[in-house]
Amino acid sequence: MVQQAESSEAESNLPRDALDTEEGEFMACSPVALDESDPDWCKTASGHIKRPMNAFMVWSKIERRKIMEQSPDMHNAEISKRLGKRWKMLKDSEKIPFIREAERLRLKHMADYPDYKYRPRKKPKTDPAAKPSAGQSPDKSAAGAKAAKGPGKKCAKLKAPAGKAGAGKAAQPGDCAAGKAAKCVFLDDDDEDDDEDDELQLRPKPDADDDDDEPAHSHLLPPPTQQQPPQLLRRYSVAKVPASPTLSSAAESPEGASLYDEVRAGGRLYYSFKNITKQQPPPAPPALSPASSRCVSTSSSSGSSSGSGAEDADDLMFDLSLNFSQGAHSACEQPLGAGAAGNLSLSLVDKDLDSFSEGSLGSHFEFPDYCTPELSEMIAGDWLEANFSDLVFTY
């Protein structure tokens, strides 16, 4: 009541002409002024207490009546749209009487309904089980929701260490810090005492995890005494070519023989130099290198044994990468003294193989020169005709 008196004094301090013009019309048209004598002026038929109107609601109620009188067929949504635009266009000075009336209604509402508390309707949730009943108070519904979330938090807390333990077998010991960060424990005040023992049991132990991870990896690898000897690891390195250029030294070299035996003893099938030279042709002159003794090289030129040792060694390694295809084996079975036609065809094959081996060592875009004499002659010829009239087409 004291606040109402203060508001009335504030109204009396305003200019009298302002009260006579807008506020007089406002009080005359105000629907609330007629019903304020009723003690249930803000209650609905079902007993629900309505909220006090704000300034826009007070103004829109008056203006809505005017619009409905002028155009009764206008839709309610269209009226609301127009009223919203007009309210935004109003000046602050024009809104003052409606703001004052809304404040007066708010104070009267507080005096008539002191126990009123604004409780907006909660939107229905998608999960019907989590939806509280309509008659339940907000405090009880909040407590029920809190109790419903409790088991879910415990389950999440139990799942996190289980998932970490399953992933610990594949993870390295250095990943233990990441596993710790993945564990999130949310505890309510009433669950802290109950969950202390569980948390102590589920808390990750860095030392134990490191010790557990090592045996998990140890069954995959043999112990240090059972690991592969260093000589068996040499099978992954490139096989050495004997340094001596003679055939006799290649067969008599103890180092080369021991290397090839270790390769065959490794338990996997590897082509050794003994398999290469198994089908040797009749003894060649001593000036031939070991790579020259292979059949493709011997057939490349009939009787000519010239060629550097480095190029022959590269050809030998290329033959290893080809895995001795059937064509190479058929070429090996030909005698050294074959006809000129056979030597010519094998020499062409040898040139193609050498060009492929050289191209594989470089870039994919380095193409060898395959120009034949006829092609080079065509390229070198005159491209422009001497007589320009020959280039003119006649139809």
Curated annotation (Swiss-Prot):
<dbReference type="InterPro" id="IPR036910">
    <property type="entry name" value="HMG_box_dom_sf"/>
</dbReference>
<keyword id="KW-0805">Transcription regulation</keyword>
<dbReference type="GO" id="GO:0045666">
    <property type="term" value="P:positive regulation of neuron differentiation"/>
</dbReference>
<dbReference type="GO" id="GO:0048485">
    <property type="term" value="P:sympathetic nervous system development"/>
</dbReference>
<dbReference type="GO" id="GO:0048557">
    <property type="term" value="P:embryonic digestive tract morphogenesis"/>
</dbReference>
<dbReference type="GO" id="GO:0061386">
    <property type="term" value="P:closure of optic fissure"/>
</dbReference>
<comment type="function">
    <text>Transcription factor that acts as a transcriptional activator. Binds cooperatively with POU3F2/BRN2 or POU3F1/OCT6 to gene promoters, which enhances transcriptional activation. Acts as a transcriptional activator of TEAD2 by binding to its gene promoter and first intron. Plays a redundant role with SOX4 and SOX12 in cell survival of developing tissues such as the neural tube, branchial arches and somites, thereby contributing to organogenesis.</text>
</comment>
<dbReference type="GO" id="GO:2001111">
    <property type="term" value="P:positive regulation of lens epithelial cell proliferation"/>
</dbReference>
<feature type="compositionally biased region" description="Acidic residues">
    <location>
        <begin position="187"/>
        <end position="199"/>
    </location>
</feature>
<dbReference type="GO" id="GO:0000981">
    <property type="term" value="F:DNA-binding transcription factor activity, RNA polymerase II-specific"/>
</dbReference>
<dbReference type="GO" id="GO:0060022">
    <property type="term" value="P:hard palate development"/>
</dbReference>
<dbReference type="GO" id="GO:0014003">
    <property type="term" value="P:oligodendrocyte development"/>
</dbReference>
<keyword id="KW-0221">Differentiation</keyword>
<dbReference type="Pfam" id="PF00505">
    <property type="entry name" value="HMG_box"/>
</dbReference>
<dbReference type="GO" id="GO:0035332">
    <property type="term" value="P:positive regulation of hippo signaling"/>
</dbReference>
<keyword id="KW-0804">Transcription</keyword>
<dbReference type="GO" id="GO:2000648">
    <property type="term" value="P:positive regulation of stem cell proliferation"/>
</dbReference>
<dbReference type="GO" id="GO:0060412">
    <property type="term" value="P:ventricular septum morphogenesis"/>
</dbReference>
<feature type="compositionally biased region" description="Low complexity">
    <location>
        <begin position="158"/>
        <end position="174"/>
    </location>
</feature>
<feature type="compositionally biased region" description="Polar residues">
    <location>
        <begin position="1"/>
        <end position="11"/>
    </location>
</feature>
<dbReference type="InterPro" id="IPR050140">
    <property type="entry name" value="SRY-related_HMG-box_TF-like"/>
</dbReference>
<keyword id="KW-0524">Neurogenesis</keyword>
<dbReference type="GO" id="GO:0050672">
    <property type="term" value="P:negative regulation of lymphocyte proliferation"/>
</dbReference>
<dbReference type="GO" id="GO:0060253">
    <property type="term" value="P:negative regulation of glial cell proliferation"/>
</dbReference>
<dbReference type="GO" id="GO:0001822">
    <property type="term" value="P:kidney development"/>
</dbReference>
<dbReference type="GO" id="GO:0000976">
    <property type="term" value="F:transcription cis-regulatory region binding"/>
</dbReference>
<keyword id="KW-0238">DNA-binding</keyword>
<dbReference type="GO" id="GO:0014009">
    <property type="term" value="P:glial cell proliferation"/>
</dbReference>
<dbReference type="GO" id="GO:0061029">
    <property type="term" value="P:eyelid development in camera-type eye"/>
</dbReference>
<dbReference type="GO" id="GO:0045944">
    <property type="term" value="P:positive regulation of transcription by RNA polymerase II"/>
</dbReference>
<dbReference type="GO" id="GO:0003677">
    <property type="term" value="F:DNA binding"/>
</dbReference>
<dbReference type="GO" id="GO:0005654">
    <property type="term" value="C:nucleoplasm"/>
</dbReference>
<dbReference type="GO" id="GO:0035914">
    <property type="term" value="P:skeletal muscle cell differentiation"/>
</dbReference>
<dbReference type="GO" id="GO:0000122">
    <property type="term" value="P:negative regulation of transcription by RNA polymerase II"/>
</dbReference>
<keyword id="KW-0217">Developmental protein</keyword>
<dbReference type="GO" id="GO:0030513">
    <property type="term" value="P:positive regulation of BMP signaling pathway"/>
</dbReference>
<dbReference type="GO" id="GO:0060563">
    <property type="term" value="P:neuroepithelial cell differentiation"/>
</dbReference>
<dbReference type="GO" id="GO:0003700">
    <property type="term" value="F:DNA-binding transcription factor activity"/>
</dbReference>
<feature type="region of interest" description="Disordered">
    <location>
        <begin position="1"/>
        <end position="22"/>
    </location>
</feature>
<keyword id="KW-0539">Nucleus</keyword>
<dbReference type="GO" id="GO:0000978">
    <property type="term" value="F:RNA polymerase II cis-regulatory region sequence-specific DNA binding"/>
</dbReference>
<dbReference type="GO" id="GO:0045669">
    <property type="term" value="P:positive regulation of osteoblast differentiation"/>
</dbReference>
